[in-house]
């Protein structure tokens, strides 16, 4: 295992149970021969490559690799567009792949700062932050079959955010739903009805907030043992609320991202034709622009298929990927103070990509709180979930108050939070408004056209990096629904 991890794990029965589970359930992706013959994984940083349809797995060869893996003793979890997701004992994986595997811990949820993610974890990891991967690289050639290309290990993704049906009372300023819609210039009567968002996140608790307000949230059941309505983290439930704030008439389908599995599985399910999804909202990513070939190809296919794909730019200095992919719409954060003055959020990330020359992140922004903890919106979450506990007074320190705690209880199902996670979900809701208006006008919007509408109509933020746009503070600025609709009418 990674240096220094042993003593930490030995003090926690919960962590040791997770270690025992990983010894028997290591998960990895095998990319198989593609239709074009190009390998998918080496293209993860490429500016250009073959048309995405040519990079999809050759069906016959994928089938042969699956049979070979089953014969070797592995479980086939998922046969997808670009390869196969496999699960099996760590010892078997190390033997078949001819590599040394190491137990590692991803940087995780801070107990002492910022709503969700930061780079270096000062305390014990959470169970879901443990993973197994090779010691030298997260990918290696697949030597067990002539029809397989590469083996890829994907660490758990980072989530950038962080029971009464009504928000709890607090003594500090919270931006309510009506104020969010005002700042985003949402016209009265626009609800996004008829639009469908595929929200890929941690789970979707049936909070009474949704039913009381008549919001249409449908957790999608993906197979035996799947429990999409269970949200131990609380993040997915909160993100759904942000979508409905802007587009109360939209439908949100929740695709649970099991952190034991590669993220492309949930994205494929969300993008399948039978899902009926128009917009795919992703408030997560990987820091330092760490890239994965199968995930990149999956996103390219979603965009090619006409889906709107949004990713959060990250919080607290994280340089997030896939947000830096030029194909996606990257969302950052703008803070509006009590006098309605707009400024870049000092909690939201922004950067010039080192992977894609000339790429500025974010493209546009939603609303986001400021450091130290991003407490700005009061969001529903699963009672007792990680998000519920994270901001509560008793979790931070008895007697602590805003801006260091949200003044809520650890199991009341509400959390003061924000981040580029929340901003991304808001923009997903705004995309629903524009898609509904496009249908009314008999027009079609794809990812490229929608990004152009959002950037052309955004409200520039004066304090951003000298005032020029786009910039690494707020991109083109804060999204504006009414202006975007005017732009749409002129297309």
Question: What is each model feature region?
Answer:
Residues 238, 254-328, 338, 408-425, ...:
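Substrate-binding/access-modulating region of protease and related hydrolase catalytic domains
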